[in-house]
Amino acid sequence: MDAIEGDFGTFAAAEDGTVTLRYERYFPRPIETVWSAITQPERMADWLGAGELEPRAGGRFAVRVGPGRRVAITGRVLTWDPPSALACTWTWPGGVETVIRYDLTATSAGATRLVFSQTGLPSDQMTSVLPGWHLYLERLGQVFDGIKPEEDFSARHAEIRVLYGRKYGTEAAVCQPTEAVSD
């Protein structure tokens, strides 16, 4: 496949050597529907992975992601503001901690604008994670379209990674940021 669903994610380098990833998507669904898909564990399992989320600031967050759901992510809910904002720490095996954030806005047409970001990502992980989140948001859109996303998405991740490599000029090295940010 030589196509990509949705706009490419962007990234910005921080002074501490990490990067911030950002994606913007529009879903033709009410904000409450999108909110439930990103916050209710039984709905998260459809597109992201099996997990749990305690619906409150300070609550526990855990999800198993990746092909075969082999990667166990843990964290804490930092922001809980239904149905417009959710932020959680996202701790990888080995202790690398980032922050993911979903900001939702209802549009006048009854759709939902979703801005997703991940901050504090080590730059050496970006070439896998940037296309990875693109894939997960693509899977979220498939769920809204009534399509069951494929269980093994390794091949699709590889396709998207190549497309991101073409867009940002690399396939294996750290990409050049689209902008710089400071803390």
Where are these regions (language model features)?
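Terminal "cap-and-tail" regions of soluble proteins that handle hydrophobic small molecules
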Residues: 1-15, 110-113, 118-183
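Short, solvent-exposed helix-to-loop capping segments enriched in aromatics
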Residues: 37-45, 60-69
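Hydrophobic ligand-binding cavity/cleft-lining segments
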Residues: 1-52, 176-183
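Hydrophobic-ligand binding "helix-grip"
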Residues: 49-56, 64-122
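Hydrophobic pocket/interface hotspot
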Residues: 34, 44, 61, 77, ...
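Short, hydrophobic secondary-structure boundary micro-motifs
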Residues: 46, 56, 151-153
